Regions:
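Structured, hydrophobic secondary-structure cores that serve as assembly/anchoring elements
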Residues: 1-118, 166-169, 219-223, 282, ...
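Autoprocessing Asn-cyclization modules and mimics
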Residues: 99-113, 119-195
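Short, cationic low-complexity segments
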Residues: 134-136, 236-243, 577-579
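Small/polar beta-strand repeat architecture
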Residues: 169-248
Length: 579
């Protein structure tokens, strides 16, 4: 309790009403697949447009090189075409994919490697030029002019221990290395030639002492990076190994060793004097690897800890994604792992593709029967789209397109609307035209067909999960519960460690009541009143004294989700004129 020791008036603020509770995002997708470039471990990359995807992961992949694993770029393109606004992408690469590296003579001194594996790195070009981060003049030579290595300079700022420096006068350049630098006093490894002649007190000096660095220019397509005034001095803040961490194209490893003589880093790397002015670096040996070396494990990924996860596991720490897909990868082991990932987290929903070759109803059912989960849905057939790479029509898996429709429906109608009876944008045809009789078999089993209707375009014509439990057979019901659960979870962190008694219970009830009332008014819950749409129980009827003693606050919530009008039936009879 507050202390009141001095007489006076005290004004205090306190929270008593319902806490605002924001709805969780449901329209952000997560994709996994092969790409030209991009990180293969760590956190998935946020992508907000297809141009953004191309900048980070490269363009479309060729069928000859990547076969049926090439569909990530097409899926992301279709996601944005069909209304998606943002997604996270994680790249997968074959185990024998190799990053490009510099192949010039300097590689034994400075190893430059593409940030991630792939033949894309062979197109990188780089060049180094001499540079300097600091320049000064010598005001005074301290000690014996013939032997002294200590000098008072105008400013020692930028002159670090271990830096190679150049003293230049009318007689040319001489290189040295700094032993100590403090308070405008610099000590070198050896005395400069010339004795007192190195001193220059003029306003416009002709004798200068400069540090020796180099600037690295990197080019890839229309991308360019410049890292200025780099050093091979390991102790310096501008050491190339530290500075290159900011690069999106290359990583660097300094293999140089300190020489007996002071040699400028440009010369150490290139073998050329600084007067050469520029040294070009060539890259090669990068490889995309062979898709024959891909396995289910590459897509499932490994949990090697934060920042080192791969494949599906890389999405563990992402709390934004709510829709997941691995476009075109129909290996049951991969798909089952994706579904298990969604079930374990309880906050996302998987969209599954059916193998392209499985077009007959019996074959489709064989694949469908592998799964039984309300956290996934399956779509067929594959879609015909225009390929910007080969300038022809190709067939792609539907998962990316459907993910875009999920996002579009969520943003325009709400998560309570079944993502069906929606037109597919950018789709010119279907690989298979299913009829009503075939859908009569597939729809009850939970296979959502995409069909073309004359005059109405190509539409998603199903909204069922892969669950055998009738309570969870509709996609929008499962996703509505995900929305409600995540919203309440994210919005009630303030409750933790609060005193667990009646005032807190009443406040929690008011908070959730206000949120669910808003959800009901948005049309997501059935009923003509909030009392019919949901209930909230919290208090002694939901908690025993043992629960309270063990720090548990238990709130029981029931909601009535709206169900889609899947079968619209009009019963028509004759009416005579006399009736």
């Amino acid at each position: 309790m507050a202390e009141y020791l001095s007489p006076g008036v005290y004004v205090e603020e306190f929270d008593s009403g319902a806490q605002p509770l924001e709805g969780a995002s449901t329209s952000t997708a997560g994709f996994i697949g092969l790409a030209q470039r991009g990180a293969t471990q760590g956190l998935p990359e946020l992508i907000t447009s297809i141009a953004d995807f191309k900048r980070v992961f490269g363009s479309y992949l060729s069928e000859n090189a990547f076969g049926s694993y090439r569909f990530l770029a097409y899926a992301v393109d279709q996601f944005f075409t069909n209304g998606g606004s943002r997604c996270y992408v994680m790249r997968v690469a074959p185990s024998d994919a190799v990053p490009a590296s510099n192949t010039s003579a300097e590689a034994s001194v400075l190893s430059l490697t593409a940030k991630n594996p792939g033949a894309w790195g062979n197109q990188i070009r780089a060049a180094i030029v001499p540079a300097s981060k600091a320049k000064t003049q010598i005001f005074e030579l301290l000690g014996d002019p013939a032997e002294s290595k200590r000098y008072r300079v105008k400013s020692s700022a930028g002159f670090n221990v271990g830096d190679v420096v150049a003293f230049e006068d009318a007689n040319g350049k001489q290189y040295n290395r700094i032993v100590s630098s403090q308070d405008n006093l610099i000590e070198l490894e050896s005395a400069l030639e010339g004795g007192l002649e190195v001193v220059d007190n003029q306003l416009l000096p002709t004798k200068v002492l400069t540090t020796c660095e180099f600037t690295l220019h990197i080019f890839y397509g229309d991308e360019a990076e410049v890292f200025e005034k780099l050093s091979l001095n390991v102790a310096a803040a501008n050491h190339i190994g530290k500075s290159m961490d900011r690069s999106g194209l290359l990583s660097a490893l300094d293999l140089s060793t300190a020489s007996a003589e002071a040699v400028p880093p440009f010369t150490v790397i290139s073998g050329l004097p600084e007067e050469a002015g520029k040294y070009d670096i060539v890259f090669g040996n990068g490889s995309d690897g062979s898709i024959a070396n891909l396995s289910a494990g590459d897509f499932i990924g490994e949990d090697n800890g934060p920042g080192r996860r791969t494949g599906i596991q890389s999405f563990i720490d992402n709390d934004v994604v709510s829709i997941m897909a691995i476009p075109g990868v129909t290996d049951p082991n991969v798909q089952l792992s994706l579904v298990a990932h969604c079930e374990n987290l309880g906050s996302r929903f998987a969209i599954l593709d059916i193998p392209r070759e499985k077009t007959k109803v019996a074959d489709v059912m064989t694949h469908r029967n592998i799964f039984d989960s309300s956290y996934c849905a399956m779509y067929n057939p594959w879609l015909q789209v225009f390929d910007p790479l080969d300038k022809r029509n190709i067939f792609i898996p539907p998962s990316g397109t459907v993910a875009g429709i999920y996002s579009r429906s969520d943003n325009t109608r709400g998560v309570q609307k079944a993502p069906a009876n929606e037109v597919l944008r950018g789709v010119s045809g279907l690989e298979v035209q299913y009829n009503n009789g075939e859908q009569d078999i597939l729809n009850p089993a939970g296979v959502n067909l995409i069909r073309h209707f004359t005059g109405q375009g190509t539409r998603v014509w199903g909204a069922r999960t892969c669950s055998s439990n009738g309570l969870w057979k509709y996609i929008n019901v499962r996703r509505l519960f995900i929305f409600v659960e995540q919203s309440i979870k994210n919005g009630t962190n303030w409750v933790v460690f609060e005193p667990n008694h009646e005032p807190l219970w009443a406040r929690v009830q008011r908070t959730i009541d206000a949120f669910l009332t808003r959800v009901w008014r948005d049309g997501a819950l059935a009923g003509t009143s909030p009392q019919e749409a949901f209930y909230i129980n919290i208090g002694r009827q939901t908690m025993t004294q043992d629960d309270i003693d063990n720090g548990r606050l238990i709130c029981v919530i029931g909601i009535a989700p709206v169900k889609p009008a899947e079968f619209v039936i009009f019963r028509i009879t004759q009416k005579t004129g006399s009736e």
